[in-house]
From Swiss-Prot:
tr-type G domain segment(s): 464-633
Location of region: G2: 498-502
Record field: compositional bias (Basic and acidic residues): 150-185, 199-255, 268-279
Source species taxonomy: Bacteria, Pseudomonadati, Pseudomonadota, Betaproteobacteria, Burkholderiales
PANTHER family attached to this UniProt entry: TR-TYPE G DOMAIN-CONTAINING PROTEIN (PTHR43381:SF5), TRANSLATION INITIATION FACTOR IF-2-RELATED (PTHR43381)
Naturally occurring in which organism (per UniProt): Ralstonia nicotianae (strain ATCC BAA-1114 / GMI1000) (Ralstonia solanacearum)
Official protein name in the record: Translation initiation factor IF-2
Gene name of the encoded protein: infB
Length: 964
């Protein structure tokens, strides 16, 4: 027969060889490695061990049989309406027959040969009973051990107490003996001294006597203290004796409990049957009697208030009804003869009575006798109000109900709900009105983490950086052309309409250093762009055309530069033109507080020509000179910080932001945060579109990889990890949304009555999509300025990127016109717009977009009605015609009278009636018009009080189209 190894047996059993080796060791089979051979005897020993460990095969034999019996019957039952219906009743009975142990059954048969029916008990019930008996045995063993330990502790305590008592008694006896001996010695010495010297002064004798008396008192006091100590020891002995007796009583109770017969456990079915029987044996009117004697009344069981229970009514007293039964219901203690409310026990109106005291269910009577009384003075709380807060949260902070806050808001003229969000200003007004102190609170702002990075950058050594120069000026004054000459590029030639509509960032390397230029638009709509350019700049080049002079946007650029506190270098452009007048430009700039250096000011004036290049070198030299004076420095080896100059959405690349690095070094792979946008820099391009690995201070770059298009002008910060950037971005989004909603709600509530009083204002809904963020902002701003009291521009949605199907769907829902500025709609959007009839307009010059929207708004204006006098008629004679009324015979003094004209009746140059002509005749013929110098007959509708000498003024009302 082939031999079997440990590893082979383990494979057959689907177990690991290590586990099988452990089981073999436990079974007493010594095997060390998986290659050892196992014999049949080893397998038998292992099998016996496993049977002993997990139960033998005999345990698996069938020991019980379950019999299930099902009976179906019908009963007739009346329902709530009184109708009788048949109900099917199914009774299921389950019996479990257990196989008895043969070894234990033989003696039972010998003792009791008669067949005895064993109770049928479920196996689970048997197991539960055994478990309960085991727990009781463990509890008794534990209690006996605790009792034994307590007895030993008490015996030790008793021995220690006896030792202490004996020591105290010995000490007491010794002290008493010493005191008595000392007193006798001193008394003997005193007597000897008195006998030896009779001449000693009496005073000394008295002192000795007093001293002896004090010593005697001290001895007496010591004896009393000894007695007190003995009494204390005796009291401790009594306490120990009482504790010992209590422990013995407890032990005796435990022994009695152990010797008592075990309580027979009953199955759940038996317990339910007994409970049902007990419920049926007694009712509310028929109390239960057991073994011929009545059950005691529930009121008698309460020992807490025995005096409250009324006296039992005698059995023969008929006034008490069934008073012969102690557990029965009794009449009221006052003895209501007419059979009033039957009560049981105490009917007093006390706190503990089941009736309760006088005052109904809301009584508080004596319960609040010692309750805390709230202070009557108002509590003034310091309420910290965040930027946005709901009405419920504000009420919670003031510890008042939300209804009180809503009432206060209604008094202030605002209808709010409990979940409505209030802005900080409104909430602080409400808090002050309700008598509390409002404090503007700072939120748990995760942006506080950014302060640490700023402090770290301050510790880094700063190095010199290139200047950032912004070119500003009026439209068509040659800003971009000037930059083109400096950069040796031709940007202006490719711009739509010959005007700049984007903010551009470039850096130029000159022999004296690097200069970064920001080119801003000059059109009035691009105010926000110019403000951003002034914010990020160090020096402003103000370009003024020598033939045009100072214009509105020139003044605005001066204001931006002064607000930013940056120096101005004036470039007087187009000096090559014959009509150039630089002196007039200087005088106009002096009136705007821009003083040239030659007049004692601090602004250098440089005449230049972007066409010929005249003065360009002098301009750059002045710019670099100003930069040296400013001593521009920034840390280089630090996390980058910058400004979003422009942002756009590319269909393939996603959000793209033009960032001007202000400090530190921006590298590819950095995690950046810009407003509510965040992300890792996936790609970085310079202004020429070439990839760049890093960008230092004052260098503009385009970055890709942001989560969304950031707002132009947002600050860009490099953070250590993306998780923190996401947390801050989400916090800013929620904060921006809450503040925006709160302000919109406040604006709606404030303007609701105004809108109702003004009537319906016509609106022109628009959806604006632009190529870059700045253009979109400028277009929205320019179009909103066109709104009037009658026609209003409503920008439903403004965003960056191409026109998509979602934009067309939004336009369909809001009935809006889509404007695409330097962007186009995709194929799906064009098809959907054609199907829905949505108008999509494309523009690449901001003038054209503004002019067309202005024309559309003019068409929406209601036409103006204009009155024009066409003739004057004098009444010469009046004829009264039956069924027609008064007919006036008239002479046309001036103009023409038409059949469809309106008429005013003038009597002594006072208008007495205005109406229209009913008929116009010349002789007997109806005519359409009568010219000057001819007579005619006419009648006026609904007016017969025409007199000779009246004058009739003939006029017409024409509608004239209005324009904005």
């Amino acid at each position: 027969m082939a031999s079997t190894t440990v590893a082979q047996l383990a494979g057959e059993l689907n177990r690991s060889a290590a586990a099988l080796l452990e089981q073999l060791q436990a079974a007493g089979v010594q095997k060390a490695t998986p290659e050892d051979v196992i014999t049949e005897s080893d397998k038998t020993r292992l099998l016996d061990y496993l049977k002993r460990a997990h139960g033998s095969a005999e345990d698996g034999a069938r020991k019980k049989i379950t019999l299930t019996k099902r009976e179906t019957s019908e009963i007739r039952q009346a329902d709530a309406t009184g109708k009788t219906r048949t109900v099917q009743v199914e009774v299921r009975k389950k019996r479990v027959l257990m196989k008895r142990d043969e070894a234990g059954a033989a003696p039972a048969e010998a003792e009791a040969p008669a067949p005895v029916t064993a109770p049928v008990v479920d196996v689970e019930e048997v197991a539960r009973r055994e478990e309960e008996q085991r727990r009781q045995a463990e509890l008794l063993a534990r209690q006996e051990a605790e009792l034994k330990a307590r007895q030993e502790a008490m015996e030790r305590e008793e021995a220690e107490r006896r030792a202490r008592q004996e020591a105290a008694e010995a000490e007491q006896r010794r002290q008493a003996e010493l005191a008595a001996k000392k007193a006798e010695e001193e008394a003997a010495a005193a007597r000897a001294a008195a006998e030896a010297s009779d001449e000693a002064p009496r005073r000394k004798a008295e002192e000795d006597a007093a001293r002896l008396a004090s010593e005697r008192e001290a001895a007496q006091k010591a004896a009393e203290e000894a007695r007190a100590a003995a009494d204390k020891i005796k009291a401790e002995e009594d306490g120990a004796r009482k504790r010992r007796e209590a422990a013995e009583a407890e032990a005796r109770a435990i022994r009695e409990m152990m010797n008592a017969p075990a309580r027979v456990l009953k199955t759940p079915a038996e317990r339910k049957a007994e409970e049902k029987k007990a419920e049926q044996s007694g009712t509310l009117h028929k109390p239960v009697k057991a073994a011929g004697e009545a059950r005691p009344a529930p009121a008698a069981k309460k020992a807490a208030a025995p005096a409250a229970a009324p006296a039992a009514t005698p059995a023969g007293d008929k006034k008490g009804g069934r008073g012969g039964k102690p557990g029965g219901w009794q009449d009221d203690a006052r003895g209501n003869k007419r059979g009033g409310l039957k009560t049981r026990g105490d009917t007093g109106g006390g706190v503990d009575g089941w009736r309760g005291s006088k005052g109904g269910r809301n009584r508080h009577g004596d319960d609040n006798r010692n309750a805390f009384q709230a202070p009557t003075e108002p509590v003034v709380r310091e309420v910290h109000v965040p930027e946005t807060i709901s009405v419920a949260e504000l009420a919670h902070k003031m510890a008042v109900k939300a209804a009180e806050v809503i009432k206060q808001m209604m008094k202030l003229g605002q209808m709010v709900t409990i979940n409505q969000v209030l802005d900080q200003e409104t909430a602080m007004i409400v808090v002050e009105e309700m008598g509390h102190q409002a404090v503007a609170a700072k939120l748990d702002d995760p942006e506080a983490l950014l302060v640490e990075g700023v402090q770290e950058q301050q510790n880094v050594e700063a190095e010199a950086r290139p200047p950032v120069v912004t070119v500003m000026g009026h439209v068509d004054h040659g800003k971009t052309s000037l930059l083109d000459y400096i950069r040796r590029a031709k940007v202006a030639a490719g711009e739509a309409g010959g005007i700049t509509q984007h903010i551009g960032a470039y850096h130029v390397e000159t022999p004296r250093g690097v200069i970064t230029f920001l080119d801003t638009p000059g059109h009035e709509a691009f105010t926000a762009m110019r403000a951003r350019g002034a914010k990020a700049t160090d020096i402003v080049i103000l370009v003024v055309a020598a033939d045009d002079g100072v214009m509105p946007q020139t003044k605005e650029a001066i204001a931006h530069a002064k607000a930013a506190g940056v120096p101005i270098v004036v470039a007087i452009n187009k000096i090559d033109k014959p009509e150039a007048n630089p002196d007039r430009v200087k005088q106009e700039l002096v009136s705007e507080s821009v003083i040239p250096e030659e007049y004692g000011g601090d602004s250098p004036f440089v005449p230049v020509s972007a066409k010929t290049g005249q003065g360009i070198e002098n301009l750059l030299e002045n710019v670099l000179l100003q930069a040296e004076v400013l001593e521009l420095k920034a840390p280089i080896n630090a996390a980058a910080k910058g400004l979003v100059v422009e942002a756009q959405l590319d269909k393939g690349k996603g959000p793209i932001a033009t960032v001007l690095v202000q400090s530190g070094t921006l590298k590819r792979g950095d995690v950046v945060l810009a407003g509510t946008a965040y992300g890792r820099v996936r790609a970085m391009l310079d202004e020429n579109g070439k990839p760049a690995k890093e960008a230092g201070p004052s260098i503009p770059v385009e970055i890709q990889g942001l989560s969304e298009v950031p707002g132009a002008g947002e600050e860009v910060i490099v953070l250590p990890d993306e998780r923190k950037a996401r947390e801050i971005a989400l916090f800013r989004q929620g904060k921006f949304r809450d503040v925006k909603l709160a302000r919109q709600q406040a604006a709606k509530l404030e303007t609701m009555l105004e809108q109702m009083s003004e009537g319906e204002v016509k609106t022109l809904p628009l959806i604006i999509k632009a190529d870059v963020q700045g253009s979109q902002e400028a277009l929205v701003h320019a179009l909103n300025k066109l709104s009037t009291g009658e026609v209003r521009v409503q920008v439903v949605h403004g965003a960056v990127g191409g026109i998509s199907e979602s934009d067309v769907n939004l336009a369909t829902a809001s009935k809006a016109v889509i404007i695409g500025f330097n962007t186009r709609a995709d194929a799906g959007a064009r098809k959907l717009a054609e199907h829905q009839g949505i108008d999509i307009r494309y523009y690449n010059i901001i003038y054209d977009a503004v002019d067309e929207v202005k024309a559309a708004m003019s068409g929406m204006l209601s036409p103006e009605k204009k009155e024009e006098t066409t003739g004057l008629v004098e009444v010469r004679q009046v004829f009264h015609v039956p069924k027609v009324g008064a007919v006036a015979g008239c002479m046309v003094l001036d103009g023409v009278v038409k059949r469809s004209s309106l008429v005013r009746v003038l009597r002594e140059n006072v208008v007495i009636f205005s109406g229209e002509l009913e008929s116009l005749k010349r002789f007997k013929d109806d005519v359409k018009e009568v010219k000057q110098g001819f007579e005619c007959g006419l009648s006026i509708k609904n007016f017969n009080d025409v007199k000779e000498g009246d004058q009739l003024e003939i006029y017409e009302i024409t509608e004239v189209a209005r324009t904005l």
